[in-house]
């Protein structure tokens, strides 16, 4: 089972409805709504190598309420109010998220660079048992774009099916991040490959795909 993430920066808020309408013929079931939060932090420690200056935090309520922290090739997959072992001394011991900890106890080390959020996204099951999640994303500056998350892709054909719909909508520019083995000649695929320290590999791969299209 593989995933892919597509981001359409040139979209308008109404693009989501147009895309959903095109999926109607393939629709098997409408499922739960979902949300997303993507944060980027930059280190304030001057002697860090440039490649280590960014930390990414992605919170996925629709994936068991997990938060994925990624810094270079290391990742931590955390549950609600779960703190990595090496940061336990910074925690108050109360129910706090890793983002709350970064904003309070670790604010002298990490500065929040950007926050991208999406709420009330839609989940659709389509032909081929592919799960399509669509959501409008917003940043502090306003509307950011349309994001599409695909789960249970079995082949490049499943991915091309979705990108073909975007082409039908005359969407000329969009970013695609796909797991290895799902490359399509019709789209520019960002390869998501890295190693993780521990945790949920599939969720780590998905988080890397989000970073590739949103950065």
Swiss-Prot record:
This is Mediator of RNA polymerase II transcription subunit 20. Component of the Mediator complex, a coactivator involved in the regulated transcription of nearly all RNA polymerase II-dependent genes. Mediator functions as a bridge to convey information from gene-specific regulatory proteins to the basal RNA polymerase II transcription machinery. Mediator is recruited to promoters by direct interactions with regulatory proteins and serves as a scaffold for the assembly of a functional preinitiation complex with RNA polymerase II and the general transcription factors. The keyword Flavoprotein does not apply. Its main location: nucleus. Belongs to the Mediator complex subunit 20 family. It is found in: Nucleus. InterPro entries: Mediator_Med20. Keywords: Activator, Nucleus, Transcription, Transcription regulation.
């Amino acid at each position: 089972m593989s995933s892919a993430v597509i981001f359409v920066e040139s979209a308008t808020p109404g693009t989501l409805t147009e895309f959903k309408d095109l999926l109607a013929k393939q629709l098997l079931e409408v499922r739960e709504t979902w949300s997303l939060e993507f944060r980027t932090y930059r280190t304030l420690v001057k002697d860090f190598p440039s490649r280590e200056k960014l930390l990414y935090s992605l919170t996925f309520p629709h994936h068991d309420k997990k938060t994925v922290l990624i810094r270079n090739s290391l990742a931590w997959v955390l549950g609600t109010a779960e703190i990595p072992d090496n940061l336990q001394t910074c925690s108050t011991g109360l129910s706090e998220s890793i983002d709350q900890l970064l904003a309070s106890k670790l604010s002298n080390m990490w500065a929040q660079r950007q926050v991208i959020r999406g709420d009330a996204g839609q989940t659709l099951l389509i032909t081929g048992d592919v799960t399509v999640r669509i959501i409008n994303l917003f940043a502090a500056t306003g509307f950011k774009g349309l994001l599409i998350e695909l789960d249970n892709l079995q082949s490049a054909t499943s991915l091309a099916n979705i990108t073909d719909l975007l082409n039908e909508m005359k969407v000329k520019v969009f970013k695609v991040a796909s797991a290895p083995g799902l490359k399509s000649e019709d789209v520019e695929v960002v390869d998501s490959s890295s190693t993780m320290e521990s945790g949920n590999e599939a969720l780590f791969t998905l988080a890397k795909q989000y970073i590739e299209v949103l950065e």
